[in-house]
Amino acid sequence: AGVSSSAGLPDWNTLLNSLLVSMLSQENFGGPHGDPVKVSEIVARLMEVDGPSTLMLARYIRKGLAVGSPVEQQGFVDAITHQLYSLRDKKFPVESELISSIAKLCTPTRTGANVKSILTYNFDDFIERALLSRSLVHKSVFEEFETPSAEELPVYHVHGFLPEDRQRYSNLDRCTLVFSEEGYHQIYRDAYHWSNLVQLNSFKESSCLMIGLSLTDPNLRRLLEIASKSIEEPKHFAFMRRLTSKKFMAGASGKPLKISNAVVERFLERHHATNEELMRELGVSVIWYEEYGDIPEILNKIRAG
């Protein structure tokens, strides 16, 4: 979810598990009334003993919902949209501090616009809402025939667009939704797919600041590598979280490592240096942060110059 998780939207695994629970509940796997608690237990056990990759799980869900006809396809899109927004943790504001700092960065200054475009891999419309609240003229682009004017800041949804209020947008039926494995395969195979061209053009012609991206997407890495062949020095920047020795020693399970702090520090120094070199090969320089709350502060400093 990246940036969107700061506004309380579910991460990918939570969204997929919820869709799977919803699908099985409709088929009465939890008993005659489709008890969601029982279904959740079934799903949890499935993930435990035979957990597929997230892309395979998404394909499994799409197949389970029998998406074939246009009506079924729309039902599938509606199901994803409903789960995406209904699972939002309401204790977080829709315009989080991070989203707000991104919108501020897009606000033109006396010398002109600092941001040429936004490329998002998320389905939601939270960036658009933040731009709208600031009366910033923009255009959501989610299919190849949409062309923003010179006055509009383009917001490219290269993996698809699922706004909460679909009535505000037209031609959403022409949107390519990269949700499951076959969607990735389609874009990977088609070098001239509009989303590939938009990304490649941005990587070649602009300096990109990557926020909330793990940079593990094979297609994204492929496009960055292609673009990097025409530059001598990295011109893009990506936020990456630096591991501290304290967190590394504690681990996710909370069981501390019985290794000296000096050894861990030396390993992490090499680990971070290696990651920096790997990113340099893709034309990307790393901006390290330790806590997620650091990112808005850094963005505000960039805006202030």
Q: PLM ranges: what are they?
A:
Residues 75-88, 162-185:
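Active-site-proximal helix-loop elements at catalytic-domain edges
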